[in-house]
Amino acid sequence: MKLHLMLLAVLLCCVTLPSRAADKPNIVVILVDDMGFSDIGSYGGEISTPNLDALAKNGLRFSNFYNTARCCPTRASLMTGLYSHQAGVGHMTEDRGLPGYSGRLNDKSVTFAEALKPAGYFTAMTGKWHVGQNLGAVPWERGFDRSLNAAAGGFFFQDSPRAKVFLNGVEASSDGVSLPKQWYSTDLWTQYGLRFIDEARAKKQPFLLYLAHNAPHFPLQAPPEDIARWRGKFKAGWDKLRAARYQRQIKMGLIDKRWPLSSRAADVPAWDSLTPQQQERYDHMMAIYAATMERMDKAIGDLVKGLQQRGELENTLILFMSDNGGNAESGVRGKLDGQNPGDAQSDVFVGECWATLNNTPFVRYKHYTDEGGIATPLIAYWPKGIAKARRGQIEAQPGHVIDIMATCLDVAGAAYPKEHKGKAITPLQGTSLRPAFAGKALNRTQPLFWEHEENRAVRDGNWKLVALANKPWRLYDLATDRTEQHDLAGTQPERVKTLVAQWDAWAARSQVLPLGGWRAEQKKGRKGEQAKGKLSQKTRFELKNGDTLERSESPSIAGRGFTITAKINAQKPDGVIVAQGGVAQGYALYLQGGKLVFALRRSNELYKATTTQNIVGAHEITAKVASDSVLSLIVDGTLAATGKAPGPLTTMPVDGLQVGNDTGGLVGAYGADNKFGGTIESVVIEVGP
């Protein structure tokens, strides 16, 4: 009898129980959008983020973790473990006819969902996808069993004009798809994430949940009661708040006191130089940003509570990070547009002034490969998998979003495939972060690399080489100068030469070249915006001062001539009358030093017609791009200036259109503070054949 009992005990110990809780961990990857390095409390911020701070206190904070500097490339790298160009998403979601710039996840990559499914995982995603849904790369065909997603974001409330959500591949407005009548996207992504987790539990499967918040990306929107709580909290201004964040970071051990706080950008004014009205405006826009952050933190708290209530928290690895640095895209002044800023119809950006606070203590912003553009928090939380002695500590080893796939595979006991659906797969580029959970060294054998919009960087150990587009390389010793204040390139030419050679070799093997491929002409014949008819078909646009059009609403001017007629009353010598596009393609009609300028930006080069006489007071102006690409300016019926471009625009500009300002990528040779000084009675644009 005793022998039988002993045998039974041995057999019970060897049986694999149907519950997944005994072995494979769950994995939750949380990506937020346009959040700076210092915005959350556990990285020095004053914005209330108690739930994230609790994860950091009981988990591990990485102080040298990186993204790719931009939305789409980071998502591609995070999901595939490849550099974004290798996955086909070297820039945004337009197909440029080049392997590294196809605008969609390619078939030489696998997502972490596709890699974890063979290991028995239930896979789900909620939130912002933005890796080529417009070109056919969709979550339900890239390994996710369940999904509730936005193709590219751009909204928070259900009544936003841009709100479009897909549930398991079916648009939410379609028959049979039911969402709450009223929702806020941050909460919606979390609610459905928990629903999908319940499906996994019912199937007794471990789960992967990829939760991609669109917060705090523009247009910044939040419930009014959330915004009201933050009004007046930022009137100390970016200078004092930035200094306070920096001191908290030093005290926390995130920042070495040897690294000086980077200087305020030259075009950002001192807070104390602003009028009370200007300070009120800036406080308002940052209150909206803080409200989106607070709501996002609360939703993460709801997710953690939901995992705890379901008995899943102990064996769930949670990874939290941002897709790029804080965003200065709207220029120095930011945007606070709409009758009720922060509601579904409004358009709010924090702008460059507050982005300097977001990215404390670093220089530059989203788009750039300086630390301000690529440094992100990474919080790792896993009660069962992170050593108790490590909890609450800071990990200084460098990491990159290419490491997320390797980490997921490692903790799940899954293998990275050599081929998928009959296609050879590009070898994994990242390394697992799991050794850091136990205080061990990462097994990294290669430097880390970056390229975005020709901004380049490589980090090998503590040495970082970085360059702006078309600018010389700069060298920094990050051990003593993480804030990139002292360029050593002139004193260490051999080190520069070695790092440049490493970057060149990486670029050649990783589909980065040709450099500038992101500006290549958009490929025809694919299911892109032009092929799908998503660009405006209108040929006449009647506009007024303050009007803003999204890209899809703007005049379709690629390969075509067009005419602008504007009635203005100029009271100041500078300012934009109308602009469409940005630094690669577009046009702008503006005053500069009293002269009227009509500029065409074609493939990054600027071609202009400029009047010799000053323009003051009331005038009717006509600016024209003829079919032979001659630029002409007519003032009150008289030809005033001409110019010549080598041809029409090669592709539709990425940025939309604005009347009276240019707050996106700057088309003309003017600064970010370019609001028109005077009145604009009307602007009419007519597009030719």
Predicted features by range, described:
Residues 2, 21-469, 473, 482-501, ...:
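Formylglycine-dependent sulfatase
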